Amino acid sequence: MINISDIPKNPGCYIYKNESGTVIYVGKAKNLKKRVSSYFNKKNHDPKTEKLVKSIYEMEFIVTDNEVEALILENTLIKKYSPKYNIDLKDSKNYAYIYISEENFPRIGISRNKSKKGKFYGPFTSAKERDYVLDVLKKTFKIRSCKNMHKRPCLRHHIKNCTAPCSGDITSKDYLNQIKKAEHILKGNIDSLIHELKNEMNEKSKNLQFEEALLIREEINAIERLKTRQNVKRDVKYNEDVISILEKSGKLHIMVFNVLKGTLFDRKYFEFDYTENFFEEFLIQYYSENDVPSEIIISELPKNLEEDNNEYSSDALLEYLSKKKGSKVAFKIPKQGEKKQLLDLAIKNLEIYVNGNEIKVQSLKNKLMLDKSPNIIECFDISHLSGTSTVGSVVQFRNGKPDKKNYRRFKIKTVSGIDDFKSISEVVFRRYSKLLEENLELPDLIIIDGGKGQLSSAFSELRKLKLKIPLISIAKREEEIYTPGIENPLPIKKNEKASLFIQEIRDEAHRFAINYNRLLRKKELIK
């Protein structure tokens, strides 16, 4: 179930998955909400896109700072997942880099091959964006692009787009200074370059060198138009993890951005109860199962890692991580630059993820007029094929997210043939009698997939167990929501946030039940 209202309007990448959780398509957008909405609101899709839309079961998104970052990240994700529909719809060849050669007077151009000597920046998934950046750099800094330097100036020199090192009109020192400026931009160090150029421009003006000051001003204007350069793809040789941490209501939320060879290629989310030594416990457990990077970027060191004289010093943790990696590992707390931008991006994604789920939970509390927030929600579904292999499922959502360790499947034992009412009665009774017997945590809200009949059956079982847990059901056809003792459905529109959240939970319970049903049928066939 795709809940459009949860999607931000930021630029970023969206990841579509099918019912089995396989990534089937990766896309990028300037406005995530607008782009994803177009898949489900537009009716006249081409056949391939229509087939894609029918296969979409769930979606993830990663927010970026701008559209160029989204372009680069899209390429990274496509290479990682090789999604079915991207392979069909996109050119699978490698994307090109902007290349600066290793010569006395380096040239600038485009290359897909990184084996030759030189410096490479990119890759660029958009040929239009790549060509624009290259064109600006060539014109702004008058860098040559010819493969072999001619003995006399070419047309680019005559239209003032090249300094013509071939003719000896510029010294090697001055030319390499222009190359250095271009490299500053391609590395993302735009602000520092603009600052240097402004100082240089002011100095020229003071010395009454107005023509040269004007040329520098033109350079600054061109550079500022390029200020949205990407910071997700960086031409570096090391790996790093970027870890953002958010504490909320006694819970710790952690998002890890994995950066491989300068490229953001994955993210992972974790949630657990707050403990005093959570950070080192998390790092030890996480890196016991994952590769240790050269750098771990974090917003701040926990207190017990800031001091060397406590029980658990930073030296011990770093020694453990370095030993596992086989080389030195460092914690970094960036205050500015690209790494700070990556950290800010990780924090932004984590806040959107956590707060988005909190908004869903609160909207449900308000619409159902519950006394407390439904932080733990369980949903039941029954699945069968013509009365055979009847199974039940219960899924649990905790703080707005699936909590799969608390999913349960039931073989129906007391019902013959098709009887959804009795089947619901059985699974509800079995589920909550066991929770009561083992003194385990009960949900704040129960959802039944079905109409008033299934709702009544579940309510009867809860009364037998003397449980007073808020209970609703959702009927498939019109997505109507019912509650015990009220004849008419609740006045909640099916496209409201609360209803969409209920539909999301119901769809997950349905998927889980169907998968179990298929498994049992397969076992029956091979007996």
Curated annotation (Swiss-Prot):
PROSITE patterns tied to this protein: GIY_YIG (PS50164), UVR (PS50151), UVRC (PS50165)
Source taxon at top rank: Archaea
Annotated compartments: Cytoplasm
GO cellular component: cytoplasm; excinuclease repair complex
Disulfide bonds: none
Pfam families from the UniProt entry: GIY-YIG, UVR, UvrC_RNaseH, UvrC_RNaseH_dom
GO molecular function: DNA binding; excinuclease ABC activity
UVR domain residues: 191-226
Keyword presence, Zinc-finger: no
Main location: cytoplasm
Cited InterPro entries: GIY-YIG_endonuc (IPR000305), GIY-YIG_endonuc_sf (IPR035901), GIY-YIG_UvrC_Cho (IPR047296), UVR_dom (IPR001943), UVR_dom_sf (IPR036876), UvrABC_protein_C (IPR050066), UvrC (IPR004791), UvrC_RNase_H_dom (IPR001162)
Self-association and partners: Interacts with UvrB in an incision complex.
Function: The UvrABC repair system catalyzes the recognition and processing of DNA lesions. UvrC both incises the 5' and 3' sides of the lesion. The N-terminal half is responsible for the 3' incision and the C-terminal half is responsible for the 5' incision.
Family membership: Belongs to the UvrC family.
Protein name stated in the entry: UvrABC system protein C
